[in-house]
Amino acid sequence: MPAWPRFMSLRRQYLYKALDKNHQKHPIKHPHTRFLSRLFCALAVLFSYSIYQSFRTDLKQSGSWGCEMSWMSPSYRRLEWTEFISTRYALYLYREQGLDSEDTLSGHPVLFVPGNAGSYQQVRSIASSASKQYYEQVKARERNVVTGKKIDFFTADLKEEFSAFHARTVREQAVFIQHCIKGILQEYTHLPQEKRPTQVTLLAHSMGGVVARLAMDPITSISVDIIVTLSTPHILPPLALERDMDSIYSLIRWRRQHISTHPPLISICGGISDTQIVSDSCALPFFQAGNNSDIAVFTTGIPGVWTAVEHQAIIWCHQIRWRIARMLLDMSSRANTTAKLVTAKEWLLDYQEDETLKEPRSERQHDYSVSSRNMTFIGLHQPSKAFVAQQCNGLERCRTVPSVMSLLPFPNNPSDPFPLPGEGIKPSEVMLVAEISLSSTNTVVKINASQYGQTIAGSREHHLVKGNSWSEFTITMRYRYIRIQLLFCIRPTHTSTFSFYCGTLLTLPRQSWHLSGDISIALMSCTTGVAQKKLLQRTGQICDSVPYGRSCMASRVGCCGSSVSIIRFYQHRSVRTCKGFKLILVGEILSWNSALERIARRRMPICIVLLLLGATIQSQLPDFPMLHTFFLGVNQLEMVPLVGILGVWTFGLLCVVSFHLISTCAIFTTLLIPFKILHVAIWSRNIWTGSAALVSTDNNFYYAIPPALLVKCASCGGTIQKRHVCLKACRIALIILIMSSFSVGARWTWILSPIANAVLILFVASII
């Protein structure tokens, strides 16, 4: 008799008796359970729909983005090294056709590291912009424009591997990057000793930033001056499916804290439009932002960009690639790391004025009467900081008054949404805001401004806002501009419509200078990421700028708004739903009456109470180490009910599995695939690309035990005597899995896989 039919006959023979006893012991005759099941189903559907609609609304209102297309003429030359250790990866030198004609290398080296499934050719956008700007500066030398070194862009071909899903791939790529850094520096041995570069700048996209940081061991870090990452998940991995991936992140944090030669890190994030990398994960941990060397900035906060950017578009978006290329050019001429960081902050955290407009060819001088010691001047359509203010009292000579200047977006069409979709803000659609402080009011202010646009003035008032909401006096009919100053924040970076990093000004631009209307202000908390909207009425020709200071701007919008933060910050929680789907596959999907009879009525209330108790303790101990990684990862007491709601939701996904009814056994032969589907995809791709490192893997044969037990049962017809013991242990393990799937936190998702496999082992053992 064939093995599989014999297994089916054995299964029917031994299971029917157990089923009869089980049904006699636990008859399902509870009418109120039917009502409870329908109520839970309705709540689950309603809650899921609310989350989906909240996310769509938030993404539609705040996630619009606009970028200009970039153009280039790329060419690549593969570098062949006699001592090249890898036959799997390759290294290329980028050259812009028509500009980079020389074959010898004489500039500053920059190595590009692509991300998950990324191509080495993605370097072309930034590299092309750097070449064009360099040769434009060369032509402008007669105009006294400072010219930095030329940039030599190298790019690593990592064969478009799935580094986000496989920790071993990340480690192998990091080793390759270490050897690339050594090889790149050897390419400059033809230069005199004093002109040879001693350090390489790393430019990485997505998971390439994790690879670049992992390559920074004590030896390699000496040869790297700056690491610039684009949309890189620095805090949490995109999918924490392996323990080794968590070990990689722990090693990166340890090296940043303990290696004195570790290069500074500049993290550029795409914001809410980046649906692949969660914005909170792209920010930097508190200990990194507090060292005054690492920088994290969102593209919404970069002057001249003012828009969120999609994950892949951050590479080719012209507004961003132009500033990154210009930043790299200016950094190449700086002698030390401190000066390079100052240059980076000028381009990313504050507007870098156009050198050709420092002294406008023609200026207009205007006199303004002083109405307050604190004055604000706004220059419309003024693309540079060509602004000089002088205080004159009629008796003494006029003296120059220091001013604090910043550029703000000024779209030509007041009815357009912001950020502008399509190509975004044009370079001419900006205005200059200058703030000055005067010694007295009995004077006249003379303004020398650029010939572009017009200049208007007004007084400036300060109001301090404390707590989590704005008081009544802040919502007046007088103000067109609201400027919010973030004085201190728990986290170094946070995202909002216009908020980008701590210690800077958040400016909400007006929509019309002529018509009254409403300004929709969307603020995101740095601790919860929940948006709060408030409408400010504006009328009249008022050009005041009102700073508000507080520790951390506000949040609290209720369940739907909270759902937005949950679904955005825990996008990878869908992995846990997949775990539940695996359990559903191995058993027959029963009615809710049967499922809730065993799980919901008896164990779920106790588990929910424990979850709520743990979330309450978490909210009362916000500074306790590692406590923020559990549950929702937030410390607000009002978020505790969401823990219970999501707990019921999680139970509803996982408790529909039955262990006491006949189910299809054919699915058991593929139990290995659901658990390691990503690794199977990686193996398949490696075979397709002809990789020689197929056996270099860290997979655990523990996951092969369930199908091995099935093979044993089908081949020899053996059974396990104490089936009821395995069945009871399986139910206990399932409860542990349900509790763990909700409470372990986003960082430790890899814990669920071995627990789920233990459930399957016990389940298979109970039916054979």
Swiss-Prot record:
InterPro entries: AB_hydrolase_fold (IPR029058), PGAP1-ab_dom-like (IPR012908), PGAP1/BST1 (IPR039529)
EC nos: 3.1.-.-
Gene Ontology molecular function terms on file: phosphatidylinositol deacylase activity
SUPFAM superfamilies documented for this protein: alpha/beta-Hydrolases
Descriptive protein name: GPI inositol-deacylase
Domain of life: Eukaryota
Glycosylation-annotated residues: N291, N336, N374, N448
Record keyword Zinc-finger present: no
Record: active site: S206
